[in-house]
Amino acid sequence: MQGAIARVCMVVVAAILNHPLLFPNENTTVPEQDEDLLARMKEHQEKLEAEQKRLEQEISQNETSVIGDQDGYGWYFWSALCLVIFFTIEVCRQDLISAEIPDPAEDEDGDCSTGYHSAKSIALDRGTLNNFCKTRFFPYTNESGRVREFIEGFADDLLEALRSICDLKADLEVEDFAGIGSMFESWRVSKPPTCDLIVPFSPPQPLRFQFELWCDPSTEIPLDLQGCGRIQLIKPGGNGTDCLCGSIDLGDDMLCLLHNRNECEVLEDDALPELLCARDTTYLSKGQIMRWFQISVSKAWGKISHKYDFELAFRNLDFPGALKIKFPSGKTVVLNLTPAVQFENTDAYLISHFPSDTSNSSDTHWQLSLSVYEKNLLKHLAKSLPTNSCHIHCLQIVAFLHKKQTTLTGRSAFCNYHIKTALLHLLLSKRPAMWQPQNLDSRLRDLLSFLQQSLEEKKLYHALVGNPRIPVEILVPKIIRTAEPINLYRPLVLQRHVYAKMEEHFEEMVRNTSVLVQEYTPHFSNGHVRHEFSSAEQI
């Protein structure tokens, strides 16, 4: 018995020691071995395994014949010991192989990323950053307030004129606008000033809108349209629960006690659905709405243009609310009016498009905008931050770098909304004390690193959708708060060349960060900082 056990141990040890990967030659990997040598080694290993199997069968037969013998206990001991030795050597061999044989994928990544710059290692001087912020962004503080006041007054006047030219009986009703974006969140970084306004509209009574969001289990919205929804124009009685006057003909001698005659005429008129909805459907068409909005804005401006001494022009005919105001002095203000539908008496809106996004080509899928909640979240979080916290400066610096990099290498899918989303995630995850003004350089690296990592992982989740960290005071609708998180990069990842361009853009921006900050920081002269902005250039 002991002789058989010894023979088994010798076979096991021989198989391990003769394994070609246990003691590889220095600087030699398996793919580099001669094929014939590998074939012979494999044949030798198969012979050893066959011999081992034969011996095991022999031992098994011997064990059966002497099962009553006390020496059988010794077999179990030696068998367990051999198993432990074999397992230990095998584990050590795997560690040795992992250390000796380089990963081809890692080599490939290393070769491709020879110019890779980690955002965590960017050289940033705290004093230079402070001077940069004081001279680049501080001049906009007071001026932005005046621009907002002017834009709000002008928008009120323009929308009031728009309402006056609309048919109250058979046309969309325009509601009060909501200001969003950098101008209304106090992080403007460049000129000319850009003001973004959401302009909600609603159908005439008794028509109403019904929503089908992507996160509703009863809807069938494609995965590449996450964050979108459809808007259905509903007549009373159209879903079997409302008044039937919208679905049957009452005749001339009958009246509906719930709706007056004008409302009934609206229900009988099929012109409005044809004007607003996609062909052969009851779903709102973005193209139809944008066409209606452009015509209405043009008529409204024609009605009030005599009151103003500036020019108003459409910057982009594809986006009807993309306006440009030009004063006689040459100063300009960019104004984006975006038609939208308010979602069930909340501050969430379904909008026709984002100014920086053209990826959604579906005519009936409207994009969800939570910009009002994001603005409120920034204000809410700022209350718990230290005085003169550095979070806004971090956002401004990265947005400034992005704008300058766009000037150098052209446009990409990367946008300021990605930057703001990353900042909101950091504000929700870091302690308020970490945003002290003296921590500007560290938090700036954190923001750049967060964006860099998100691009590498191809994941940047929406800051509000499905995020349990959002304070309850923000009052995000439950259906959105409990939905699955949305990856903002997903539509871009599906377009490889677009995503590759975005990654290249950001890597160049990280590489140029220190140089751009130094270049656009005014020099000191006689102990004072030289301001490069004149009052005429600030707008």
Swiss-Prot record:
It is a single-pass type I membrane protein. Residues 32-68 form a coiled coil. Enhances Ca(2+)-mediated inhibition of inositol 1,4,5-triphosphate receptor (ITPR) Ca(2+) release. The gene is itprip. Residues 1-24 form the signal peptide. One of its GO terms (cellular component) is plasma membrane. This is Inositol 1,4,5-trisphosphate receptor-interacting protein. The chain crosses the membrane at residues 72-92. It comes from Danio rerio.
